Amino acid sequence: MEKNIAVIWGDCSSPEIVKQTLRVLDKVAEKYGHTFHYTDAAMGGEAIDKYGDPLPQHELDKCLAADSVLLGAVGGPKWEGLPGEQRPEKGLLRLRAGMGLYSNNRPAKIWPQLAPASPLKPEIVAQGIDFLIVRELIGGVYFGAHETHTLENGEKQAIDSMPYAEHEIERIGRIGFETARKRRKKLCCVDKANVLDTSRLWRSVMHRLQAEYPDVAYIEMFVDNCAMQIVKNPAQFDVIVTENMFGDILSDEASMITGSIGMIPSSSLGDGTRGLYEPIHGSAPDIAGKDIVNPTACILSAAMMLRYSFGLAEEADAIENAVSKVLDKGIRTADNMSDGCTCVGCSGMGDAILAEI
């Protein structure tokens, strides 16, 4: 198989994890007889420094021409003082919208080898934590109208709107049901229907979809209760589907109960097979250039790309199994280090995973 991958190296420590990820992809390509072509695309702080824009059209075009996009992480203190439209994170929003990616999928799973690192009580962890958050990605308050104006008394007032159309809810809701059907057949829709009209519209659309999936156990939960249940009883969840902002917050919360944000990949998909694959963590500017950042989440994101965009399940399994074997051997990066284990840096973890493929 021959595939073209757009590579966004990202900012701060991000190029370090992307470098290790490409080493792993090259190893997989060599072992299984594939060819992966890489095209560098600038976004975020790198693009701001080069072009004065977090995502110029010519860089977006590179991503649109590729079979999928691999991203490290963008942002950092250097660009924090810029206006909102010029910040690195705005490039990511444009990329998602430009690629038509409306479904972000983030697993929350505790690797058995890292269970002691979870902040949850051992008896809660022992019940098993393995759920997926399906987050609507290009609607809601992040893409609604934003306004700041001055009232008659001179006080400033800001307004952000949370628009959703039925078709936007239906397509992400259907992904939620289809994903649950392939897993343990349980779906929880998270909203705030006791307050928000958009959430009540979500419920009406989800109720219509529910009739098409009688084999999926469907429930609804307010977002504040869900935030509590994720730390109180996470084993109850299989698939959670929710709107953009709620999903952003809940998936970050869920990442912390796993013990290390450096182990969690994500995928963003639309109607076709092309997707955007990235770790959920940030660019870690405080440790940039020190060869200590954990590359595993980015490497596992590449495994998701092989599985979901390229249909290469065996190759994806090879990467995931290699990571598991490395953890079995007690090899850790600093973020999930524990007594009796061997601490390695970013390149050392890359070496260890390569050795197991």
How would you label these PLM feature ranges?
Residues 1-5:
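Extreme N-terminal starter segment of soluble prokaryotic enzymes
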Residues 138-139, 143-183, 187-188, 193-195, ...:
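Glycine-rich phosphate/pyrophosphate-binding loop and the adjoining helix
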Residues 49-159, 245-247:
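N-terminal glycine-rich phosphate/adenylate-binding segment common to multiple enzyme folds
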Residues 26, 30-34, 65-68, 97-104, ...:
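Generic secondary-structure signature for well-ordered alpha-helical cores
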Residues 6-23, 28-29, 153-224, 236:
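Glycine-rich phosphate/diphosphate-binding loop of Rossmann-like nucleotide-binding domains
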Residues 45-48, 231-331:
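Glycine-rich phosphate/nucleotide-binding loop
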